[in-house]
Curated annotation (Swiss-Prot):
The gene is S2. The keyword Hydrolase applies. It holds the Pfam family CPV_RdRP_N. Interacts with VP6. Keywords: Hydrolase, Nucleotide-binding, Nucleotidyltransferase, RNA-directed RNA polymerase, Transferase, Viral RNA replication. This is RNA-directed RNA polymerase VP2. It is an enzyme of class 2 (transferase). It comes from Aedes pseudoscutellaris reovirus (isolate France) (ApRV).
Length: 1233
């Protein structure tokens, strides 16, 4: 078979851009044209005319040749007919039968099913239609646009001929697209179409994406897609879940089989400083390897298993292991979300699972004399393990009490009222209905009344009533569906606000636990490699040794346990969960804390010895005790098919505020207590080198010989069982997993298949173009260090994002349509739509005012503009024929990308720093600037803002404010109003008194509405287009002058010093994208991780980004404060009012004043841009790290000048790492590269 040509790196010219835009416009305009585009691919069919007959291609693992084919199984091409026995009902038709063949969508003839009548199918008629709709998951546009974006990229870069040929064969089977996915679900299904095809087309996109990024080869991609096809023959998602664990059972053996591996050494900062040959001999549980081999052979499809075994024989290094794992991940899952009817998922999602022991109920030791159900203290039976855990928990009480912020408690409930669902719907109060005149606003309020913050504002008068709380405690809790990638669908309890109010008290008491305990991990807070520092460190320990124990040779050293706590929410028994609430009652003793109807009181208490006495109880303690008395809450679902389906009592409601905190605390106490009792019972200690816990994720680093570690882990499993939990063991000396982050012998093995570019959990959520671009960039940020070839990833993003997001549809009154179309068509491709008039006369006034669809194609370059899509720009041709430098995937965002406008404008013949109007027009950059300046792609938000009644919002905000024991918001509003009278208007979201208002506005802004009610071109925008669209020019902005610089690497006399990182990583990749001499490798090894900046320089560096030291402030509000201080003086009345409006007091105010003074003095040394820690990950984020790349004679002595130079040079190096050579760079002002 033919092979692909060598890699090509196309540069952007006006001609090529026009060709991409016109092709995209054509295929996005008509489905027929898109279908024709996809199947008319002569290059692909000529190179691979037959992909069904086995042929040889290279694998990504050491270029090993493998036999591949793509044969669509007969059951997919000729699917069975649907019958109701596929989803049988129980005997009284109140739910699905417990013992049924499928929980997810199975394979059957889709077209034939849709032809069946409701009379024939009965209840299944609607249920199965809804089940099929779960397969519609497209994140942007539709399936076919996404596939077109993939194919357009592959054609542009002359790649993927075999995959393209396979797609042609799939699509020509129907002679058209087999179905269409829209906002309203699937339509136009063709005969002989299996219900598996939507997910299989996502699978095709998934393997194609992995191939594009070189995570796998094209041959691997075909193998993986064939595996997906075979899995889909009966029930695709059920089968994937069954086989999921089989794909990586070989990992531990292959690590062991290496015997030795070149391994990086990390210092205390997490930086590589050397390497060594590590003994990879594994910690082995009896017969573990043999059992895993048998499981793999039985679980995996024979065709995939055969190739897996072939590739395993090629493994020689840790990098090879990670390569093969990546292939297995691509074959295992397809980046789709596991979605089904909640009625089919309930048994796995929320139904209580009985495992191990029944946890004993705590014995009350004190209670209210008048109501013994209100228990104030209790102890677990002394023989139970929970009794020992409870005593261990008590050791934390004093520290927890010290950390509680008593002054913040009154406002804490309001802060928890998010814009998420409140779990229960309400009727709008009559008073509110009477206040609303606009039907559109009434619609928004009705939709938004189910959101926490708005619902509480509407029902605030009932805040102090006990009856609503009692009602909500006995109410059947609504289940909110959560779909996940690679994990079965979950059910989150939609907790009502009143239950949240009670539960929040326990949370406040225990919130500091994560701060004061050793084990709780704060997870992915930084987003960079510091999150996996512990795994990097403990998988690279050298202290493994062989010892003799009773004549047997054993290993001693670090063992990493990545044990899985199975279904923690469904396994936690009520009696076990009560421990935290009982502790909270004691922790909160002695403070002033009122909660709703529960107020400070003097209560008569009776204890277990029969003593009766009086005691002060605060509202928080009473609220918890009330909650405990009603803790046996039933979780269930309100089924649209079966009515109310109650769940058995005992499930831990995963929607509680305390859920993550409770699980973290419970597991920490369990393991710490077990380590203590282990020593007491057996007279030997187990060395826990490190322990990380967050929610139900546990990573345990143990030190000892194999026998002792195994003995302790068996003991730990038993202790988990005594609490009704199942701990599935997974120990290794070579690898560990925590929070889905996997490290193997010091290498980060990121799970690329967990990042979904093409699918979304909720495909119906509509976002603006700007929001979609931000989301797409965030997805790319997540996948960079999980991907082998990030240059190809970036090339793909530029084309794919343009194809799926460039079609923008809005509405305009009919009488404006022709004028607007004519004006826009002078520079843009315009999508035209016919008008469907009310009557025959198109001149009728009613028809003239009708809203009519019109669309534009957003220019290709918009997606690479600052303020637009902000994809790092590619290499563009200038007027003189030269090309700009391409910006790398690590490039900063924000104002930094405006440098590209000057890069493309300045030439050797015309080096003057300027924006060239001609080149702006040539690449439509002036149009992009117009779209951004006039917010033309965010029409919905502006129209929604005109609907929302601010007076009503203020009333609702005041309702919530009445719950606080403070007048700070009122003082803030008065100060803001005084400033307004003086002509100073502060941003509403920065004024403390209006922050509740802004949260309520956000609820209404985010409610989904139909296109018929939003996205209409208003008069102001219409006028702007008609008057300024043609003549708009890109203007130079304040601060742009600082873009006039370059780095000159031509002085070969000033050489870069070869450092320890370069030597250590000469043959090692610590992540997939960090192969030696790759962009990430160059940045990691050449930037200085340990630059020691002085205090003065640190302050200057923070200022250059717009910060002051480590002080955090709202940037918009700070800008306003600088204006006020500059005009009126720092000690002026307006400044006092500003601080009152912002609720900035005491030490924070002093810091703010200090920041203002510094800013005013050094305002010319600002160069802000944004970098995302996830995008850089291993790469140093410290701007000063660039110092090692700069000619030292060129660096100024002044701290602010030095900081500004470092900041500019750092952005340049991140954007153009390929320019780094053996020489240090000279910083050159007043010259564009």
């Amino acid at each position: 078979m033919a092979t692909e040509p060598n890699e090509i790196n196309l540069r952007m010219t006006q001609t090529r851009m026009k060709q991409i835009e016109d092709t995209t416009f054509k295929i996005r305009r008509k489905h027929d044209d898109m279908y024709t585009y996809l199947i008319n691919d002569i290059e692909a069919t000529e190179m691979y005319p037959d992909t069904e007959t086995p042929f040889r291609m290279k694998s990504s693992l050491n270029n090993t040749y493998i036999q591949v084919k793509c044969q669509i199984p007969k059951l997919i091409m000729q699917p069975p007919l649907y019958n109701n026995d596929m989803y049988p009902l129980n005997h009284n038709s109140t739910n699905f039968l417990e013992d049924r063949p499928f929980n997810y969508l199975c394979n059957f003839d889709w077209f034939e099913f849709l032809s069946r009548s409701k009379d024939e199918l009965g209840m299944h008629y609607n249920m199965i239609r809804d089940l099929i709709s779960m397969s519609s998951q497209t994140r942007y546009s539709n399936i076919w646009s996404n596939i077109s974006g993939i194919i357009m990229y592959l054609r542009q870069y002359k790649r993927g001929f075999a995959l393209r040929s396979i797609l042609i064969r799939l699509l020509t089977y129907w002679n058209n697209f087999p179905f269409f996915d829209t906002w309203d679900g699937f339509k136009d299904v063709l005969p002989k179409t299996s219900t598996a095809w939507p997910l299989l087309f996502y699978a095709f996109m998934s393997v194609a994406f992995d191939y594009i990024c070189e995570n796998i080869s094209e041959g691997d991609a075909i193998v993986c897609f064939q595996n997906h096809l075979e899995n889909a023959q009966i029930s695709y998602q059920d089968t994937k879940l069954e086989k999921k664990n089989g794909y990586t059972l070989w990992l531990k053996y292959e690590c062991h089989n290496l015997r030795v591996a070149l391994t990086p050494r990390y210092d205390y900062t997490g930086t590589v400083y050397g390497n060594f040959l590590k003994d990879t001999t594994e910690y082995i549980i009896t017969d573990e390897f043999e059992e895993n081999e048998i499981k793999m052979k039985n679980i995996l499809n024979p065709s995939f298993y055969k190739i897996l075994q072939q590739l395993r024989r090629e493994i020689k290094t840790v990098e090879d292991i990670i390569r093969l794992l990546t292939i297995c991940y691509s074959a295992r899952d397809d980046r789709t979300y596991y979605g089904t009817l909640m009625e089919l998922a309930i048994s796995k999602a929320i139904k209580p699972q009985v495992a191990g022991s029944i946890v004993p109920k705590p014995i009350p030791t004190s209670w209210l004399q008048k109501d013994p159900k209100i228990v104030l203290s209790a102890k677990y039976p002394s023989t139970s393990f929970l009794s020992q855990m409870q005593e261990f928990y008590r050791r934390y009480y004093p520290a927890l009490q010290r950390e509680i912020d008593v002054h913040a408690l009154s406002a804490s409930f309001i802060n928890f009222l998010s814009t998420a669902s409140a779990g229960v719907g309400i009727e709008l109060p009559e008073e509110i209905i009477n206040m609303v005149k606009d039907k559109r606003l009434l619609y928004l309020l009705k939709k938004g009344s189910g959101k926490r913050v708005l619902q509480e504002a509407l029902l605030v008068e009932r805040y102090n009533d006990l009856d609503p709380i009692i009602n909500d405690f006995v109410r059947l809790i609504k289940i909110v569906v959560r779909k996940q990638i690679e994990r079965r669908q979950r059910g989150i309890a939609g907790i009502p606000n009143n239950v949240l109010k009670i539960n929040q008290v326990t949370y406040e008491a225990n919130k500091p636990f994560s701060k004061i305990a050793r084990a709780p991990s704060h997870g992915k807070q930084s987003g960079n490699a510091s999150d996996i520092h512990d795994l990097l460190f403990y998988t690279t320990q050298e202290d493994v040794s062989h010892i003799e124990v009773n004549g047997k040779r054993q290993m001693r050293g670090i063992v990493i346990s990545s044990a899985d706590v199975k279904g923690m929410d469904t396994h936690i028994q009520i009696n076990a969960a009560m421990n935290q609430h009982l502790g909270a009652i004691e922790i909160l003793d002695g403070i002033q804390y009122d909660v709703g109807p529960f107020r400070q009181t003097r209560a008569v208490i009776q204890d277990i010895q029969g003593n009766v006495y009086e005691r002060n109880l605060n509202g928080g303690q009473q609220a918890i005790a009330f909650g405990l008395a009603n803790f046996s809450q039933t979780t269930g679902i309100n089924s649209k098919y079966f009515g109310q389906i109650p769940n058995q009592e005992g499930t831990f409601p995963s929607g509680l505020i305390t859920t993550s905190n409770h699980h973290t605390q419970m597991l920490t106490l369990l393991i710490e207590t077990a380590a203590t009792t282990f020593t007491n019972e057996f007279g030997k200690s187990i060395a826990i080198a490190h322990l990380m816990i967050l929610g139900d994720d546990v990573s345990l680093m143990l030190h000892g010989n194999d026998k002792d570690v195994n003995f302790f882990m068996k003991y730990l499993v038993e202790k988990f069982s005594q609490l009704g939990l199942i701990l599935e063991r997974d120990e290794s000396r070579n690898f560990g997993v925590f929070l889905q982050q996997h490290v193997i012998n010091g290498r980060f093995n990121g799970f690329s298949n967990r990042i979904a570019i093409f699918t979304s959990e909720d495909y119906k959520t509509r976002k603006s173009v700007q929001e979609s671009c931000t989301e797409y960039n965030a997805l790319i940020d997540d996948v960079i260090f999980r991907t082998y070839n990030v240059r190809k990833l970036l090339q793909f993003q530029r084309i794919h994002q343009f194809v799926v997001l460039s079609k923008y549809i809005f509405r305009v009154q009919n009488y404006k349509y022709e004028k607007l179309k004519a004006k826009l068509a002078t520079r843009l491709n315009v999508f035209e739509y016919d008008l469907k008039p009310h009557n025959d006369s198109r001149e009728n006034v009613q028809n003239q005012n009708m809203l009519r669809f019109i669309g534009i194609q957003i220019p290709y370059t918009y997606f690479q503009c600052s303020g637009g899509g902000e994809i790092p720009p590619e290499s563009f041709q200038r007027k003189d024929g030269s090309f700009t430098y391409e910006y790398s995937i690590y490039s900063p965002k924000g104002k930094w990308l405006r440098k590209f406008l000057y890069d493309i404008s300045c030439t050797i013949d015309e080096p003057k720093f300027r924006i060239d109007d001609e080149i702006m027009r040539m690449y439509n950059l002036d149009i992009c600037d117009f779209l951004i300046q006039y917010n033309m792609l965010n029409i919905q938000e502006e129209i929604r803002a005109t609907i929302i009644d601010r007076e009503l919002i203020s009333k609702l905000a005041m309702n919530l404010e009445s719950l606080e024991n403070s007048n700070a918001r009122m003082i803030s509003r008065r100060a803001s109003e005084s400033l307004r009278i003086m002509g100073i208007k502060l941003p509403a979201n920065g004024v403390y008194g209006y922050q509740i208002n802004e949260r309520l506005v956000k609820v209404l802004q985010n409610i989904q509405q139909s296109d018929y009610e939003v996205k209409m071109v208003g008069d102001a925008l219409f006028t702007a287009i008609m008057e300024k669209f043609d003549s708009h020019k890109v203007r130079m902005e304040k601060g742009d002058r600082l873009h006039n610089f370059t780095l000159d690497f031509s002085d070969k006399s000033d050489r870069l010093v070869i450092n320890k990182k370069m030597i250590a990583l000469h043959n090692i990749s610590i992540s997939k994208n960090m192969a030696p001499y790759s962009d990430a490798w160059m940045l990691y090894t050449c930037l200085n991780h340990t630059y020691n900046a002085s205090s003065e320089l640190s302050t200057a560096l923070a200022h250059s980004q717009g910060h002051f030291k480590s002080f955090q402030y709202d940037r918009d509000m700070f800008a306003e404060s600088v204006k006020i201080a500059s005009k009126h003086g720092i000690g002026s009345l307006p400044m006092e009012l500003f601080f009152e409006a912002s609720n900035i007091r005491d030490s924070a105010q002093l810091k703010w004043i200090e920041a203002i003074k510094y800013y005013i003095q050094f305002k010319d040394y600002l160069y802000p841009y944004s970098i995302n820690p996830r995008r850089l990950f291993f790469i140093p984020e410290q701007v000063s790290s660039v110092s090692s790349l700069l000619n030292q004679d060129n660096i100024p002595a002044d701290a602010n000048k030095k900081a500004l130079m470092f900041r500019r040079a750092y952005a340049y190096v991140l954007s153009h790492p390929f320019r780094i050579s053996g020489a240090k760079a000279i910083f050159v002002d007043d010259r564009i590269s």
